Amino acid sequence: MKKVAVIGTGVIGNGWITRFLANGCEVVAHDPAPGAKERTIQAIENAWESVEQLGLKEGASKDSLTFVDSIEEAVKDADLIQESVPERYELKHGVLKEIDRFAHSNTIIGSSTSGIKPTDLQIGLNHPERLVVAHPFNPVYLLPLVEIVGGEATTKEITNRASVYYESLQMKPMVIEKEIEGFVADRLMEALWREALHLVNDGIATTEEVDKAITYGAGLRWAQMGPFMTFHLAGGNAGMRHMLEQFGPALKLPWTKLEAPELTDELKERVIQGCETHANDRSVEELEKKRNEFLVKLIDLVEDYWP
C-alpha cells in the first residue's frame, strides 16, 4: 500500500492521515470545508511527536500529503480509500457513491462510520463488495484497534485484504463476522455511558466520582485485559466456571438499568470455553502475575500523568 486517499478531514480523518503518513504512505486528501487544509497541517504537527515516540516506518514524512479539490482527483490512483465524513447517513452514502464512481473497481473503501451497518452503505454502489467498515478509535494515530465489518455484498477475500492493509499500519484489526449497528467496542462503551448517565441523573454519583471509579478501578485492569479475562481471574483457580457459579445469579439483581441476558447453560459454556481458550494454557496464577506486573507500571503512569 503506497497511496491512500482520505475523504473528510475532521478529527478522525486527520487522525487517519497522521497514521498513514507515519507509516510511510503517500496521502491525498479532500475536504471542501474552508480552512480544512490548514487545520489538517496543524493536527499533524500536534500529533507528530507522539507518533515519533511510537516509531516511524521507513519513508514516513509529514510532507507526503497533498490536498486536492475533488473526490475524483483524490481517489483515482489510490490503493486504499478511507472515508471519514460526518456521521450522517445521507452524507456518507452520497460521498461513498461518488468515491465508488471514480475509484478503481478493486480498490478497497474503508468507512470510518461508528455505527452504520455496511450493508446500508453499500446500497446503490457499482462495486458494493469492496466497501467495508473500518472503524477506528480516537486518537486514531495512537490507538491500534480498528473494527472491520463487511456487508451482505462483501466477500471474505475483501475483509482479509482489508485486515492485512490495516495491520501493515501497526494496527490491531478485528474482523466482525456479523454486522450490527455500533459494532462491538462502541456498544460496550455505550452500555457503560448509559449507566454512568443514570448514576449522575439519579444523584448517586457526580461525574467526577464516576470517572474516578473507572480511572482508579476497572479502567486500570481494562488497559490490559477485557471483562471476560478479568472475571476469569476473579474466579480463582477454577476461573470463569467458578465465577459464573458464584456470581451468575447476581445478574438478576437490579444493579444496572440494563437488562441482562438469560444465563443459559449454552451461554455459560460459551463463556467458559472462550476464556479457557483465551488463557492459552496459562494458569490463573500465571495470568495474575502478569496482570500485577502490568498494573504496577500502569498505576505509576496514572500517577505521573493524571493526578
Curated annotation (Swiss-Prot):
Q: Primary place of residence?
A: cytoplasm
A cellular component term, taken from the record's GO annotations: cytoplasm
Function as written in the Swiss-Prot or TrEMBL entry = Catalyzes the NAD(+)-dependent oxidation of L-carnitine to 3-dehydrocarnitine.
InterPro entries xref list? 3-OHacyl-CoA_DH_NAD-bd, 3HC_DH_C, 6-PGluconate_DH-like_C_sf, 6PGD_dom2, L-carnitine_dehydrogenase, NAD(P)-bd_dom_sf
Question: What family does the Swiss-Prot or TrEMBL record give for this protein?
Answer: Belongs to the 3-hydroxyacyl-CoA dehydrogenase family. L-carnitine dehydrogenase subfamily.
Catalysed reaction, written as an equation: carnitine + NAD(+) = 3-dehydrocarnitine + NADH + H(+)
Instruction: Write down what this protein is called.
Output: L-carnitine dehydrogenase
Q: How does it assemble?
A: Homodimer.
Keywords recorded for this protein, A-Z = Cytoplasm, NAD, Oxidoreductase
| Enzyme class, first EC level, given as a word | oxidoreductase
- Quote the subcellular location field of this record: Cytoplasm
Annotated EC: 1.1.1.108
Q: Which SUPFAM superfamilies does this chain map to?
A: 6-phosphogluconate dehydrogenase C-terminal domain-like, NAD(P)-binding Rossmann-fold domains
So where does NAD(+) get bound? 8-13
The answer, when asked if NAD is one of the entry's keywords, is: yes
Kindly give the Pfam families that the UniProt entry links to this protein. 3HCDH (PF00725), 3HCDH_N (PF02737)
Q: Does the keyword section mention tRNA processing?
A: no
Q: Which GO terms describe its biological process?
A: carnitine metabolic process; catabolic process; fatty acid metabolic process
